[in-house]
Regions:
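Short coil/turn linking the two alpha-helices of tandem helical-hairpin repeats
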Residues: 155-156, 160-162, 202, 220-232, ...
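Long, intrinsically disordered, low-complexity segments
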Residues: 21-22, 82, 95-99, 112-113, ...
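Acidic, glycine-rich segments characteristic of secretory precursors and extracytoplasmic regions
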Residues: 2, 10, 21-81, 88, ...
Length: 649
């Protein structure tokens, strides 16, 4: 909820036994009896509900946003900065304890239990207070939603976890993990409570609604019946799939897709048009207020997908080009899974051109000339001689050579599987969905964009997958084709047009006055990559025959060795999730729940392939939790710790 203070009265969850840096959001003074009593009042309940929203920000505020969700999968591999390399390579450093400069397993665990503890406190205080006002019932719904959402997040990563459903008044150290089945039961119950209590329409920016609960109910039910749970979920499948589809259809009936896929990423400033789209069901709220610049108070996801450009000729780092953390490098699976002639989503998701912003004393180049270009072409292309070409390729609009061009399939290495550009760890087309040009300086990490937690584009794919699991393949294509219809080029559309959050860098942006240089180009390498004549004709991506899927999908299916109709269609759904949701902090969970993680990582992520094992579809339980809990008043033995650890770890 924007422009509202974030309550400092978070109650530390007792399951977060490891040392947590609470100084960002825990005001020790509020552990006094006076303030505990205040939280029991109806006004205190309202204040505590604000803290629930602060917890949602965590998913965008730190490196865990990508470490837990996008590392070690098919879409991306590790980039030039290896801070989270172990999460991609599954090497010996990746386990219950992660050392070095890297995300730790306990970080997500601890933060989710902090939110759960706040939700537990609010739920108990409302019930004990006997409050029944409309506003307080909505706050109760928010607490049930967050508790269900946080447990869903934990189960998606770790499997069964300890279920804590009441607040703690004294320190507790004796816990055991509930089964995944029991956790799912609780998640469904909490989200159903939220669905009943939350308003149908948000009255405040970013408010949880009935549709948010329905979306995550559908997602939870789909997860419960997925392959990772096949050792116990048989009795749930029929009803869960029916209910999943019902909830998804309800959400779809209430939310329109953005007319143009690029509308989602056309960020021009806080609270701009792209943050108010009807497609967005729920988003963690951020803005340009730096007064609370700690903890979860700003969005850092703009940093992690960006490749190096400051070291290339006639270039230097600037605000719209972003600060290059280069944590995640785009994979060839991602390059090739799109129909790059007819599907606009690749070109609207990735930055393939940047302008000269540092010509120095050059008499040939000036600011605004095309300085860097990534050609994402197809195997067999012979137009470009090398993977990197300096001052060789001519830009047709100016007649000048382009200082730096990288080519996915150069003539001397242009067969499927050659992956020439992966020889460069620092240079690749950056995912541009989260770029933030509204920052104050080139080094500023403080992002201002909202973080999307649910949008109806995904809801369509949830519905499609539910139908695939019911064997209703043609019906599933209907939902997939709706997204593909939006992705196709429309009559008159400029296919080389590109927008991203760099567009927020303009006269009104905080950093514009002192940092006028600008690498932003509202243009992509569509024509240079595809090698076709300019056109404004419409395209079609409609799939009509499940036995004759698009060439991009058939290639993945062959690579993975699928033959059954079900495996082929589930593969299509997962491929479509890449095309629609690439980089949106969901991939690891999707591949883990469908037990396709290992096969896809081995096929499309050569760094992960060497170490990934079948048991790695579950994360290791944090060692800090195992070391901190007790049994019968004593620390756990090594054997007792292993009993609570996931298999293989």
């Amino acid at each position: 909820m924007k422009n509202k203070y974030i309550l400092n009265a978070l109650i530390l969850g007792t399951l977060s036994i490891s040392t947590i840096s609470c100084s960002d959001f825990l005001n020790e003074e509020l552990t006094t009896k006076r303030n505990t009593e205040y939280l029991k009042t109806e006004e205190g309940v309202a204040d505590l509900s604000v803290a629930l929203y602060e917890n949602l920000r965590y998913h965008f505020a730190r490196e865990n946003s990508v470490a837990f969700t996008q590392n070690g999968v098919d879409e991306f591999t590790v980039g030039g900065d290896g801070s989270n390399a172990s999460w991609n390579s599954y090497d010996g450093n990746y386990g219950p304890t992660v050392t070095s400069n890297s995300t730790k397993p306990e970080e997500l665990w601890d933060e989710m239990y902090v939110g759960i503890s706040n939700a537990n406190t609010l739920i108990q205080n409302v019930k004990e207070g006997g409050y029944t006002s409309v506003a307080t019932m909505e706050h109760l719904g928010e607490a049930y939603f967050l508790r269900g959402f946080n447990y869903y997040t934990l189960v998606a990563q770790f499997g069964g976890v300890p279920l804590k459903l009441t607040p703690s008044t004294t320190p507790q150290r004796e816990f055991t993990r509930a089964s995944a089945e029991d956790c799912y039961k609780q998640i469904v119950e909490d989200l159903k409570q939220a669905y009943t209590l939350l308003p149908a329409t948000a009255t405040k920016t970013g408010q949880m609604t009935k549709d948010a609960a329905a979306h995550f109910l559908a997602k939870t039910l789909l997860s419960r019946v997925s392959e990772r749970n096949d050792d116990w979920n048989a009795s749930y499948k029929e009803q869960d799939l029916k209910d999943c589809l019902t909830y998804a259809q309800e959400v779809i009936s209430h939310h329109a897709l953005a007319p143009n896929y690029s509308d989602l990423w056309n960020y021009t400033g806080p609270d701009g048009a792209n943050e108010k789209l009807d497609e967005i069901i729920l988003a963690a709220q951020f803005n340009a207020d730096k007064s609370g610049n700690t903890g979860n108070s700003y969005n850092q996801t703009h940093l992690y997908y960006i490749s190096i450009y400051k070291d290339l000729p006639y270039m230097k780092r600037d605000i719209p080009g972003e600060r290059e953390y280069q944590r995640l490098r785009t994979s060839y699976y991602t390059y090739d899974v799109y129909d790059k002639v007819n599907d606009s989503r690749f070109w609207k998701s990735f930055k393939t051109k940047a302008a000269v912003n540092n010509p120095k004393n050059s008499t040939y180049y000036k600011k605004g000339d095309l300085g860097v270009m990534y050609v994402i072409n197809k195997p067999g292309d012979t137009r470009y001689s090398n993977v990197r070409m300096n001052d060789e390729v001519v830009y047709s609009k100016t007649g000048k050579t382009i200082p730096t061009v990288f080519v996915a399939y150069p003539a001397n290495k242009n067969q499927a599987g050659d992956n020439a550009m992966l020889d460069f760890t620092q240079f690749y087309p950056s995912l541009s969905k989260f770029i933030d040009g509204y920052r104050e300086s080139v080094t500023d990490r403080v992002g201002t964009r909202d973080g999307i937690l649910a949008r109806v584009g995904e809801t369509y794919l949830i519905a499609a997958e539910a139908l695939v699991r019911q064997g209703k393949y043609q019906e599933a294509l209907g939902y997939i084709n709706t997204l593909r219809d939006r992705a196709a080029y429309k009559q008159g559309e400029d296919r080389e047009h590109h927008v991203d959050g760099g567009a927020a860098y303009k006269s009104g942006a905080p950093g514009y006055k002192d940092n006028g240089e600008n690498t932003y180009m509202a243009e992509c390498s569509y024509y240079e990559s595809n090698g076709i004549a300019e056109t404004t004709a419409p395209t079609s991506l409609k799939i009509t025959d499940i036995n004759n899927l698009p060439a991009e999908d058939e290639a993945v299916i062959r690579k993975l060795g699928y033959t059954s109709a079900y495996d082929r269609m589930l593969c299509l759904v997962l491929n479509e999730r890449t095309r629609e949701l690439c980089g949106e902090f969901q991939r690891w969970q999707d591949l883990a729940r469908t037990k396709t993680l290992v096969a896809r990582a081995r096929a499309f992520n050569s760094i992960a392939a060497a170490n990934i094992k079948d048991y790695m579809v579950l994360r290791p339980i944090p060692q800090t939790y195992l070391d901190g809990i007790q049994k019968n008043g004593h620390a756990l033995t090594a054997e007792e710790k292993q009993e609570q650890q996931n298999p293989g770890w």
